[in-house]
Amino acid sequence: MITGELRSKIDKIWETFWVGGITNPLEVIEQFTYLLFIRQLDEVETIKENEAVFLGIDYKGIFPSDMQHLRWNQFKDREAGEMYQIVLNEVFPFIKGLHQEGDSAYSKYMNDAIFKIPTPAMLSKIVDGIDNLELGDKDAKGDLYEYLLSKVATAGTNGQFRTPRHIIRMMVELMKPTPSDFIIDPAMGSAGFLVAAQEYLRDNHADLFLNAGLREHFNHDMFTGLDMDRTMLRIGAMNMLLHGVDNPIIEYRDSLSEQNTDKDKYTLVLANPPFKGSLDYEAVSADLLKITKTKKTELLFLALILRILKNGGRSATIVPDGVLFGSSNAHKDIRKEIVDNNKLEAVISMPSGVFKPYAGVSTAILIFTKTGAGGTDKVWFYDMKADGYSLDDKRQPIQDNDIDDIIARFNKMDEEVNRKRTEQSFLVDVDEIRKNGYDLSINKYKEVEYEAVEYPKPQEIISKIMTLEEEIKQGIEELEKML
């Protein structure tokens, strides 16, 4: 989570945008992100230059020798008017033109990017503010993006809530992406899941970059992100490029419509799809309605995931609690489809405070594998009580954190067999789930131990009351004598 100092600095920059007339939060984020991107391009270039010197090899960077003045560390200290002209007329066209040699995701969505900062003085103040942000590690950069995105007042009007990075990382750790995976987030937002997946691969499969085929797959075919918000597509494309993925497949597409024809294509889905949207039947792909006839986006996305996964493909998806126990035919149909025709592996119940202060909804993570032929045997349930942060609007860091325990228990499923229903995690046989109408809420199967409380006998209570009454009577008599 973001530190108080970083939050304060971002708020000051945000205020500069606001005072300068850019008051739409999405526009602020977009302009803020362009300048962050320009700064980080220079930082990445400097790191690569230093590595080349250390290794004694030639390095051809993205800034040609005649364009060195376009680098952040070259223009940031210039006089306001001169800086403004450089950024407006040279730097911004330069970043829009990156990767134009191919039909890259980045170039596709940067084509209609517009530089909107109106005055040299405003730009100078914003550049100073961004230059003073301490962004030395990837956590700080992630915190900054997360906090910026939290300021979008419209996020959530269509049910899209940002997923906290530590929850994203947990889901990625549980799914263990491999170098041969085809990974998709069908409601990608700023590409948080895709960024976390590529970080996991760099940390755990660094040798993939020594293999030309795997390296090509990583940079061009492995990652797919879909969204209907062009601003978020731009931010997501910049986010992936800054994290070293050259050309992910990022597309403007309504995942639930007939426009999306993907089927049996991906090996891993990581998603937190919109919860609160409600669509007309006409806007939804007909084959999704065959699985579950509903207007609810959270159910339709589960049907979509089953369609787009290859057999053997896995999914970790966040759903609102209502998906787990909803009594409508549509709710039951999608749960039945996952349990009976595929392999449901885990239901991780999360506390409602996980999405605060932006949403107080209770959620769970469903982990399943597409088989098309069943396979559900025992389903693992975990009752997450803490995620390392307070569950109020402040979300301050605390000691209690179940995330490491969740990952450890999930990876040692053999040891879960003997756990009791009174423990934080346990296994439930699929037949019991069927008997309970495919209810997947943990409270349906959890057992609570009640400690026996011994109360005094009625005669003892009456005796104590009478003694107390006598003491009160004596006290009143003594008080009357004093008057």
Where are these regions (language model features)?
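Non-catalytic, mostly N-terminal accessory regions of nucleic-acid modification and defense proteins
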Residues: 1-179, 249-260, 349-353, 375-390, ...
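Short acidic (Asp/Glu) and glycine-rich catalytic loops that position anionic groups and cofactors
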Residues: 11, 124, 216, 246-250, ...
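Conserved Class I SAM-dependent methyltransferase catalytic core
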Residues: 28, 228-233, 250, 295-368
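Short, contiguous acidic/charged loop-to-helix segments that flank catalytic cores in large enzymes
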Residues: 23, 280-296, 322-330, 351-358, ...
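Conserved S-adenosyl-L-methionine
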Residues: 157-271, 276-278, 287, 295, ...
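Conserved nucleotide-binding/hydrolysis micro-motifs of P-loop NTPases
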Residues: 42, 190, 230-231, 257, ...
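C-terminal, active-site-flanking charged/polar segments
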Residues: 343-344, 356-406
